[in-house]
Regions:
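Conserved acetyl-CoA-binding loop-helix of GNAT-fold acetyltransferases
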Residues: 26-36, 179, 185-202, 224, ...
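Conserved beta-hairpin
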Residues: 47, 147-163
């Protein structure tokens, strides 16, 4: 078990947070967990799917499962650029990269409390939509300051969502993204799902060979979109949480 202190969450959610990261071979140790979480208010545990010892042990000690994280990947050479749905959007979609703080703020202002309705902070009654939004805004701002690429999806001349791109060697990592609330449930998830490949391709990042990102099991609409494009599931992790006030 790896113990990860999360000091940034004090600003994001107002609680001292620790994350317990398990491997598939770890055996649950109650004494070890009690020692690790001392002094923290919000406890998060990530357990590889199949490690029942840690899953049941955490649950018996008051942790509650809130989601499963699905780690997807896709090799660009395996992506179908001639897909029929992509052809329907051809000429209607473009990407606009945020280059300065003013453009970052414009994107932050378009984000609304119910935009991230499948996020675990949003869904947790202790936190709720407003805290979830605050956390996402802080997260995106910090990513932007660290040099992560931030861009919007422009559909028929209107910004309908955003995504991020953190290119590490040949891999496009996608920390976060979403469709703006007013454009949800309109079939535009296809734009978000394909952007992980199309953005680096169309913007000239020739060294990028694949993409990788995590999606919550609570987000069924996007899971359907990624499955439609045959993204590969590389990993699954149970995510459990506990409040200690």
């Amino acid at each position: 078990m790896q113990i990860q202190d999360c000091p940034w969450e004090i600003e994001n959610i107002g609680k001292r947070t620790v994350q317990l990261n398990y491997t598939k071979d770890d055996i649950y140790n109650q004494e070890e967990v009690c020692k690790a979480v001392k002094g923290y208010q919000y406890l998060v545990a990530k357990v590889p799917v199949g490690n029942i010892s840690c899953l049941l042990g955490l649950q018996s000690d008051g942790f509650k499962m809130i989601e499963t994280q699905i780690i997807y990947s896709k090799r660009i050479k395996d992506f179908d650029f001639n897909d029929r749905l992509l052809r329907m959007f051809k000429g209607k979609v473009s990407f606009k990269q945020a280059k300065n703080t003013e453009q970052l703020i414009s994107i932050l202002e378009r984000m609304t409390p119910n935009m991230f309705s499948t996020d675990r902070i949003h869904l947790d009654p202790t936190f709720g939509p407003e805290v979830g939004l605050h956390r996402y805004r802080n997260w995106m701002t910090n990513e932007f300051k660290r040099g992560t690429i931030l861009y919007e999806f422009i559909f028929e001349g209107k910004p309908v969502g955003f995504s991020t791109s953190k290119i590490n060697g040949t891999i496009n990592h996608v920390p976060l993204g979403g469709i703006y609330q007013e454009y949800q449930n309109m079939g535009l998830g296809i734009i978000a799902a394909s952007s992980t490949v199309l953005f680096p391709t169309e913007m000239g990042y020739k060294d990028v060979k694949s993409c990788r990102f995590a999606v919550s099991s609570n987000n069924m609409p996007m899971i359907r979109c990624y499955n439609y494009f045959n993204y590969r599931v590389d990993e699954l992790e149970y995510v459990l949480v506990k409040h200690k006030d």
